[in-house]
């Protein structure tokens, strides 16, 4: 891909919100292999799916021959970015942040290549801020920032203008830290481009200005739009919570199901944002879906692409196997690990003692019936199955033979209501 084609592709995908100087950036990318960076602050022990857009942007640039730097904010994570946040962040202890830094580093690494001429680099801004004292910070960095200009930034104004929440000097100083990151990475690695979400525009331009002042070097910024949904609800959240990249926090099955549930109004945009299918391929999928009778293919393709990208082929196959088994009512191909995923976050799950094996009690405990009386009615009407096999006896007790892998029984009422029993 030529460098002109790279920016054209990003624009066609809708992935460019703003640049500090598009023409000059285009010229730079055409002229040389550029080192670029994106920062990831450790605000939790895992990144969520909103972080995928910048991670994949680093990957897109690397595939085009440029060198990506993933900067984990071991120092900035101790402060907290106030950008468009309604309230002050909770400050976490250094040892907690250090653990989160390591987890995030391990999450980002698999997306990038650390071999070849444009091998990726992992960095941690604690390496330079940890050695800097307050006087150095105020003299060498602070003197280059105008408080007048900082106060005018939209993200700061939103906090200042709230009666219930102001902004501390700690968070107010955040943009100085992020700005210095750019200057430091420019000095250390020749970094000339910073990318980030559109909410980072103020911090990014602080960095381009500071780098020009400190290093007498022209550098650039590029932001991506924040991911939004057509219905106005928050992207990356479900009724059960945030969708994380860590498989221990969001199972690959739940992750796959999240993408399968994408609205028709969002699916093709998300394919452009989150997949490496070409814009033309995505347009063809959209066109075929318009004329297709029945369910569109876009959601399945999106779920497959992103699940494999994040969790790998084996995890995708497991998610597909679980999905097919539940749909077909045939559990014979499921593994113990598959059931563990369902118990983690795939289905409503209850823990029962093996001595409490009555089906009526289990239906009530699992929320498939409001009462034992209602449970009896459902059983008698043939609406209840255990592990895919219908049960019509009111005296039915769930025996050892129905405890798959000695631990799990899948209860179902009607066509779509499930409860997984995890026997203790």
From Swiss-Prot:
Reaction(s) catalysed (UniProt annotation): tRNA(Tyr) + L-tyrosine + ATP = L-tyrosyl-tRNA(Tyr) + AMP + diphosphate + H(+)
Quaternary assembly: Homodimer.
Chain sites annotated for binding ATP: 237
GO CC annotation, single: cytosol
Molecular function GO labels: ATP binding; RNA binding; tyrosine-tRNA ligase activity
InterPro entries (alphabetical): aa-tRNA-synth_Ic, Rossmann-like_a/b/a_fold, S4_RNA-bd, S4_RNA-bd_sf, SYY-like_C, Tyr-tRNA-ligase, Tyr-tRNA-ligase_bac-type, Tyr-tRNA-ligase_bac_1
Chain ranges for the short sequence motif 'HIGH' region as given in the UniProt record: 42-51
Alphabetically ordered keywords of this record: Aminoacyl-tRNA synthetase, ATP-binding, Cytoplasm, Ligase, Nucleotide-binding, Protein biosynthesis, RNA-binding
Stated role: Catalyzes the attachment of tyrosine to tRNA(Tyr) in a two-step reaction: tyrosine is first activated by ATP to form Tyr-AMP and then transferred to the acceptor end of tRNA(Tyr).
Gene3D superfamilies, A to Z: HUPs (3.40.50.620), RNA-binding S4 domain (3.10.290.10), Tyrosyl-Transfer RNA Synthetase (1.10.240.10)
Location in the cell: Cytoplasm
Family: Belongs to the class-I aminoacyl-tRNA synthetase family. TyrS type 1 subfamily.
NCBIfam families registered for this protein in UniProt: tyrS
Official protein name in the record: Tyrosine--tRNA ligase
EC number: 6.1.1.1
Gene Ontology biological process: tyrosyl-tRNA aminoacylation
């Amino acid at each position: 891909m030529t460098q002109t084609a790279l920016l054209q592709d990003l624009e066609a995908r809708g992935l460019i919100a703003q640049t500090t100087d598009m023409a000059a950036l285009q010229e730079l990318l055409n002229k040389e292999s550029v080192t670029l960076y994106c920062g990831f602050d450790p605000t939790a022990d895992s990144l969520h799916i909103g972080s995928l857009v910048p991670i994949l942007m680093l990957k897109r640039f690397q595939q085009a021959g440029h060198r990506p730097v993933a900067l984990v904010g071991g120092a900035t994570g101790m402060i907290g970015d106030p950008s468009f946040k309604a309230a002050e962040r909770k400050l976490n202890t250094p040892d907690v942040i250090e653990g989160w830094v390591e987890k995030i580093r391990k999450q980002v690494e698999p997306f990038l290549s650390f071999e070849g001429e444009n091998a990726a680099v992992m960095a941690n801004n604690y390496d330079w801020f940890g050695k800097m004292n307050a006087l150095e910070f105020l003299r060498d960095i602070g003197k280059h920032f105008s408080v007048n200009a900082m106060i005018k930034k939209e993200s700061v104004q939103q906090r200042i203008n709230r009666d219930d929440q102001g902004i501390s000097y700690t968070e107010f100083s955040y943009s100085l830290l992020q700005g210095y990151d750019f200057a430091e990475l420019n000095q250390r690695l020749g970094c000339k481009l910073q990318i980030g979400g559109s909410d980072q525009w103020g911090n990014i331009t602080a960095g381009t200005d500071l780098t020009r002042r400190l290093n007498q070097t022209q550098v650039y910024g590029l932001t991506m739009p924040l991911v939004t949904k057509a219905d106005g609800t928050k992207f990356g959240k479900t009724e059960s919570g945030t969708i994380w990249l860590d498989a221990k926090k969001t199972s690959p099955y739940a992750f796959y199901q999240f993408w399968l549930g994408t609205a028709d109004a969002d699916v093709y945009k998300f394919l452009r944002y989150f997949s490496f299918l070409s814009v033309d391929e995505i347009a063809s999928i959209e066109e075929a879906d318009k004329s297709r009778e029945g369910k569109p293919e876009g959601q399945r393709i999106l779920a497959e692409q992103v699940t494999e990208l994040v969790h790998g082929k084996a995890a995708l196959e497991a998610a597909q196997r679980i999905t097919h088994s539940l749909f077909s009512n045939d559990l014979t191909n499921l593994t113990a690990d598959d059931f563990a995923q369902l118990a983690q976050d795939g289905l409503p799950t209850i823990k029962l003692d093996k001595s409490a094996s009555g089906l009526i009690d289990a239906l009530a405990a699992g929320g498939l019936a409001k009462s034992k009386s209602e449970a009896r009615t459902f059983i008698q009407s043939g609406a209840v199955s255990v592990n895919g096999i219908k049960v019509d006896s009111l005296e039915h007790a769930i025996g050892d033979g129905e405890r798959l892998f000695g631990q799990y029984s899948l209860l179902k009422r009607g066509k779509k209501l499930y409860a997984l029993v995890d026997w203790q």
